[in-house]
Every structure is written in C-alpha cells, then in structure tokens.
C-alpha cells in the first residue's frame, strides 16, 4: 500500500487544482473519485478568477486547445431592457474572459491533465471509511467493483462536491439555507445552422422573469445550449400541473420574453432535472488532518456562477497552506483558510440576496450608471471578491442597499438623489 502525502476525494475542479499544485511541488498525491468520467454536473458558466488558478497549476494549456465558447461577460434582460456587462470593465487587475462549458467534457479534460502530471485517479471508488488518527496521518477506505482498497496519507482534502463525503462520515454540521429556492434545468440541441438565424447566439444571458425568478441561457460550442430556471419554489407550480418535467419546462419557457421564438420548440437532450433547496454551508471547514474545499464546504446559488470559482479558489488555497505547513511554516487553518473562504462567500451572498430582492435589478438598469461603479460591480461578478480595495467588496453588506435607495430617490426626484461615494 502506497503512502501518500495527500489524498484528495473528488476529481472535479477543486480537487484537480489542489492535487496539481501539490504534485508540481514534489508531493505524492492520489485522487479518489466515486464516479466514472465523463459525467454530468451543473455549473457550466465559469468566472475569470478561475483562469488564474488553472494557469498557476499548469492545467490551463490543456483547456486552451479545447475551443470552448468564450465568455467575455454576461447579458442581463428585464422586459425590453438589456444590459451587457463586460469583464474587460474590471476594477481589479486580472483575467477579463473565461469560458462557458459542458462540464462533463470540461472536467474530464481537467482530470486527464491532472493524471498527466503523474497523479493517479481511482475512478468508480466510493469512500466508505476514514480514520483521522492513523499513524501515517489518515487512512481512507474506498470500495469499487473489485472490493475495498485502503489509502494512507499525511493529510486529506475533501473536494467531493455535493457528495460531501466527510460531512456524512464524520457527521459534520451541513446547514441548508432554507430560502425556498430551487432550480430546473436541461440541455437542448441548437445546430450551428439554426444559430446562424439567431441574434448573438453564443451570448450567455440571464433574463429576469420575476423579481425572484430568472432564466439562464448558456450556449456551448458543441451545438448544445444549457437552459435553466432558478427562483422561489412558488414559481414552479407547473411541475404539479404537468405530466412530465419537460412539459413543465416548456410551460416555464412560455414566460420568457427575451429570446422570442428561439426556444418555442426545444429539442431536449434529456428530461429536465430539478434541484430543491440547493444552498448549504458547513460550520467548520477543517479538522484534524483534513480540510473541506469546493461545494462540499458550501454552495451559494447558480446566479453569478460562483460555484466553480469558489471551488478552484478554495482548492488552491488549501493546497498552498498544506505545502507551507510541510515546509515548516505555521498554519492556522481557521484564520488562514476558513475566515477568508467565508469572507469571500459573504461578499457573493450579499450580491445574491440583492439579486433576489430586486436591489441589484434596480442598479443594473439604472439610467446613467457611473462607469466606476459599473467597474467595481463587474469586478465582483468576475470573482474577485477578496479585493478589499474595491468598495463594493469592502462594504458589500450595505453598499448595494444604499445604491438601490439612491436609484429609487433619483427616479422620484432626480435633483435630490446623489450617488454614494465609492472612492
């Protein structure tokens, strides 16, 4: 039995980034993955923040040759109003573009690039037991079709996503947000010939259907488009009235206005999926000889596409701290890991809540939105939620409400309202 420096559970974006960083620095790493790749997973819209993570871990070259659809920003639609936000208008220095991707293919490319570094990935292995006080550090038991295997290492990184391996095995407190939100989504076929008849066919777009209901359109470069509705569960009564989820989805499609007849007769590739009460978080992100990264640490919301960005950021952060600790540098996992991860999540949560209560809609579609404000907001939406020089990060818990109030005042009395100082 090989003794490793680190065992990583999960071969998604968080696990592959963490494993690659450690392997590049000479550490022995193994990945245990429950599923066989390629496999479907949601989270198809990426953020520029992650591009730097893939660059730093040497995974970017494998992605660059795939010809994924380039995402340079996002379009927001409210009735007849349209707002295009470009990542190039970014307050924080960093990447100004990314991709929108079919995750089954994308994650498989990442996994193969990780394996090419000499990191073994054991697919089809379900973790059934964890011992955190083993003489070697940790011992993990995993089972596949041929039986059980044991792995030992100095440290365990749980990047198992929604599977939440350690949450289940250790009985960790995983809390649901309880906000009543749900998502229904699917993939449809759109041939290049059909797309040639559509205006801006590759533009990733988000339409506000109601204050707390929105519709996503994410076109891929493989003639497939991801469609989804997200919002409070009261908007999904079509599920109760329809003979199938595809019929319910078609009923929901009739509510969108921003795409005309484009989705009048959708060619579903599979029956739409439904996820209820998807938001969750863990009280503790680390413990003796282990750390949680990615979605198993918590997930906020599909809006603004923060999932993969937090996955790669937390995976890289954990790997860097682990490498530092193995080189004699003291690491306080609470102060150095949990606090910054939760701080970034809190910033994004402010924007998510401002989206669902309508404040951000007001700001987005306000007439004559100042360029500096737009750049600072775009920086957050690009994933740079740790840039405290950005007032829309540093004052995230109050500045959006204040600005929305200013927009309301301006609409009522343009001569009175003043935009808050964001310098």
How should each PLM-predicted stretch be described?
Residues 40-80:
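N-terminal FAD cofactor-binding segment of flavoenzymes
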Residues 233, 237-321, 327-334, 338:
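FAD/FMN-dependent oxidoreductases across multiple families
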Residues 113-259:
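Predominantly flavin-linked oxidoreductase catalytic cores and closely associated redox partners
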Residues 320-423:
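C-terminal helical "tail/cap" subdomain of flavin- and related membrane-associated enzymes
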């Amino acid at each position: 039995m090989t003794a490793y420096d680190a065992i990583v559970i999960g071969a998604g974006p968080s696990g592959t980034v963490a494993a690659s960083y450690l392997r590049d620095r000479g550490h022995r790493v193994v990945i245990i993955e429950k599923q066989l790749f390629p496999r479907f997973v949601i989270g198809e819209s990426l953020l520029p923040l992650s591009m730097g993570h893939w660059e730093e871990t040497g995974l970017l070259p494998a992605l660059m040759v795939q010809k994924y659809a380039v995402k340079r920003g996002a379009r927001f639609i409210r009735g007849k109003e349209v707002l295009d936000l470009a990542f190039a208008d970014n307050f924080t220095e960093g990447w100004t573009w990314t991709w929108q991707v079919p995750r089954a293919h994308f994650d498989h490319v990442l996994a193969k690039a990780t394996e090419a570094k000499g990191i073994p990935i054991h697919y089809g292995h379900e973790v059934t037991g964890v011992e955190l006080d083993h003489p070697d550090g940790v011992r993990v038991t995993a089972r596949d079709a041929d039986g059980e295997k044991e792995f030992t290492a100095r440290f365990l990184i749980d990047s198992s996503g929604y599977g939440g391996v350690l949450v289940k095995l250790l009985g960790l407190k995983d809390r649901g947000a309880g906000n009543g939100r749900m998502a229904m989504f699917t993939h449809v076929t759109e041939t290049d010939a059909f797309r040639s008849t559509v205006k801006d066919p590759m533009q990733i777009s988000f339409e506000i259907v109601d204050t707390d209901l929105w519709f996503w359109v994410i076109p891929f470069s493989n003639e497939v488009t991801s469609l989804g509705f997200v919002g409070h569960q009261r908007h999904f009564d079509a599920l109760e009235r329809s003979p199938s989820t595809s019929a319910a989805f078609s009923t929901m499609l009739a509510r969108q206005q921003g795409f005309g007849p484009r989705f009048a007769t959708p060619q579903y590739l599979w029956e739409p999926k439904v996820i209820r009460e998807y938001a969750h978080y863990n009280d503790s992100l680390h413990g003796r000889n282990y750390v949680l990264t990615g979605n198993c640490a918590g997930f906020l919301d599909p809006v603004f596409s923060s999932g993969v960005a937090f996955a790669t950021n937390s995976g890289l952060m954990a790997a860097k701290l682990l490498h530092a600790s193995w080189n004699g540098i003291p690491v306080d996992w609470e102060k150095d890991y949990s606090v910054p991860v939760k701080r970034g999540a809190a910033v994004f949560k402010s924007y998510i809540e401002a989206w669902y209560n309508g404040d951000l809609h007001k700001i987005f579609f306000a007439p004559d939105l100042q360029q500096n404000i737009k750049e600072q907001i775009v920086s957050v939406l690009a994933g740079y939620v740790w840039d405290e020089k950005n007032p829309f990060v540093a004052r995230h818990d109050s500045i959006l409400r204040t600005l929305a109030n200013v927009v309301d005042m301006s609409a009522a009395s343009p001569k009175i309202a003043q935009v808050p100082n964001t310098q």
